[in-house]
Amino acid sequence: MLKKSVKIGESELSIEVGRLAKQADGSVVVRYGDTMLLVTAVSAREKKDIDFLPLTVEYQEKLYSAGRIPGSYFKREGRLTEKETLASRLVDRSCRPLFPEGYAYETQIIASVISSDPENEGDIHGITGASAALWVSDIPFDGPIAGIRVGRVGGQLVANPTAKQREQSDLDLVMAVSRKAIVMVEGGAEEVSEADMVAALDFGFTTAQPALDLQDELRRELNKQVRSFEKPAAVDEGLRAKVRELAMDGIKAGYGIKEKGARYEALGKTKKEALAKLKEQLGDGYTPLVEKHAKAVVEDLKYEHMREMTVNGGRIGDRGHDVVRSITCEVGVLPRTHGSAVFTRGETQALVVTTLGTSDDEQRLEMLGGMAFKRFMLHYNFPPFSVNETKPLRGPGRREVGHGALAERALRNMVPKSESFPYTVRLVSDILESNGSSSMASVCGGTLALMDAGVPLKAPVAGIAMGLVKEGDKIAILSDILGDEDHLGDMDFKVCGTSKGITSIQMDIKITGLTTEIMSRALEQARQGRLHILGEMLKTLAESRKEISQYAPRITTIQIRPEFIKNVIGPGGKVIKDIIARTGAAINIEDSGRVDIASANGEAVKAAIAMIQALTREAEIGKIYTGTVRKIAEFGAFVELFPGTDGLIHISELSDKRVKSVSDVLNEGDEVLVKVVSIDKTGKIRLSRKEAMAERAAQQGAAAGEAAAQPAPAPTQPDAKA
């Protein structure tokens, strides 16, 4: 067994090899604080006949790691949660680019959280563990890499912040770094500037380097030899030259077409004609392998031409590198929804709809630390018709979950807190057309749909997808990339934010040598594009509507004293159920005494509030009330002023005359006028009937005197005709 440790942030990171899961090709236990992950890597020995890497990553949180039993009927973990899916994507995006080209062997990485420290999240250590498991195995992998989280508390950057620090942080970045470069970035922020974001990236890159040293030390001591594997047969240079001659002119012409459908049709026709001519030229020499290589060459030529065109100032449709496609926005397009918008940018279109609900509609999440509740959700859907394809409709895939999370993170901090806006908010983004940047269209459409619904956003948010291509000393930064440009770049990144700063960012960086200056330039160009998009959006709707939809529930919040909660709920919930049944309003009561009353009918809300206030009224000294006698005693009578609130009338306070027996004046069930004389520290209320009667008599006497003092009305004049 080997174990290496180093301190990163406030805790020690250790990687252990050779104790658990020894039959896997690579297996490590990563520990940070009391959080531990078992990460394994296994790669098949038999190659698949495919042209991509068949990599599967599964990040799973075992509930036993936090001493909990699953709450499901079967009492065991089920399918991956959204959180686990997102963590799996982080590991996948970090590791996938580092496998050798042409490696077509089925590979699986499983990262299992086996001990959970509530102060230290496991996702970033899944990245480090996956790299370590691959690095100590014989699987070909161009590592190592390490995961790190960067926060900012009180203006100071923090590595791997604790849960408490994350609550105070205005930045939450997850990064994967290698020796030479940042590989992957995913994170959210509270309107952080571009300069501060670059500083955070630099900090994370430097701070994570010791985790790479650990992995290198383990690899050296284990001295594992990397396995050999069958590489794809090299393409004959003569064949490459023939295909270039047959296809290159058509490829150049195709990429000059602006419209996506026509461009794809032209490029498809070029490929088909080139293969037909090649078959005619080669005759019997045109084998299935030759055809496969020829098709690969066509794709290589498309990639080559696109990059060459880009670094030399060109672009599909002759668009400038910093030019955003034409934008149209519509709001209020669906009359019965609470808020809706259609955002169209070029050939990408999103229909985004807002639904407002009560706290009962919050999403319940079973987490390692217990149950959690989520009041803002964004769900992203990518139907096949959006790209003119036919596929069966299934549940959301990992890509849809990831895109939805990116857009949700962009908007989350701009949605007001429940104290000022007590609604659960669900956004649904249905992509109707797609030609790049659909997740960013969801952000822009989401902002408009929220504003249309009357959600008082702190600031509107827009998003833009960017690309960066570097060939030698030539650098091209592309704003608002198309689908064809998405995979061509050396850095693909998406930036969302307000006019003030960044709220969400996602980067995948494929090369080394990107300096701070280049990244600053790229983020500045993204900022300019974002501001342009915001300007176009605000032409349609400049601010949130003042009123929510007539079809949305009206939620009114009142505060009662916590000790009165039992009065409102009643035995077995009898009282609150009766209020709900009689008014039709939804009612939620929190332990703090906060009460949310919701209904689309304003009168129902008023009625429910009146009933709750009647149950939670407090007696005030000096005020007169009509109460009900509940109990007679020798020394006085107990009177219920309102439900749950009783007071005592001492026998001496029943009348201004001497009373021998309380029952001579009052009986149980009688209604009686009383005045609150005092309330002691324990809440006991002393009442007086005689003071109430005297005060009421004085008021009536004063009113009678005022009436007598009024001048008599003038006599009616007799009719002139009489």
Swiss-Prot record:
Q: Record's superkingdom?
A: Bacteria
Where this protein primarily resides, as one coarse class?
Answer: cytoplasm
**UniProt function note:** Involved in mRNA degradation. Catalyzes the phosphorolysis of single-stranded polyribonucleotides processively in the 3'- to 5'-direction.
Q: Name one Pfam family in it.
A: RNase_PH_C
PROSITE patterns assigned? KH_TYPE_1, S1
Enzyme Commission numbers on file: 2.7.7.8
Family statement: Belongs to the polyribonucleotide nucleotidyltransferase family.
Q: Which Gene3D superfamilies match?
A: GHMP Kinase, N-terminal domain (3.30.230.70), K Homology domain, type 1 (3.30.1370.10), Nucleic acid-binding proteins (2.40.50.140)
At the top of the EC hierarchy, this enzyme's class is transferase
Q: Which GO terms describe its cellular component?
A: cytosol
| InterPro entries, sorted | ExoRNase_PH_dom1 (IPR001247), ExoRNase_PH_dom2 (IPR015847), ExoRNase_PH_dom2_sf (IPR036345), KH_dom (IPR004087), KH_dom_type_1 (IPR004088), KH_dom_type_1_sf (IPR036612), NA-bd_OB-fold (IPR012340), PNPase (IPR012162)
Q: Which CDD domains match?
A: KH-I_PNPase (cd02393), RNase_PH_PNPase_1 (cd11363), RNase_PH_PNPase_2 (cd11364), S1_PNPase (cd04472)
Q: Which SUPFAM superfamilies match?
A: Eukaryotic type KH-domain (KH-domain type I), Nucleic acid-binding proteins, Polynucleotide phosphorylase/guanosine pentaphosphate synthase (PNPase/GPSI), domain 3, Ribonuclease PH domain 2-like, Ribosomal protein S5 domain 2-like
Q: Which residues form the S1 motif domain?
A: 622-690
Give the reaction(s) catalysed. RNA(n+1) + phosphate = RNA(n) + a ribonucleoside 5'-diphosphate
GO biological process per UniProt: mRNA catabolic process; RNA processing
Q: Which cofactor does it need?
A: Mg(2+)
Identify the residues that the record assigns to the KH domain, covering every copy. Answer: 553-612
The protein's UniProt keywords, in alphabetical order, are:
Cytoplasm, Magnesium, Metal-binding, Nucleotidyltransferase, RNA-binding, Transferase
Single GO term (MF): magnesium ion binding
Q: Which protein is depicted?
A: Polyribonucleotide nucleotidyltransferase
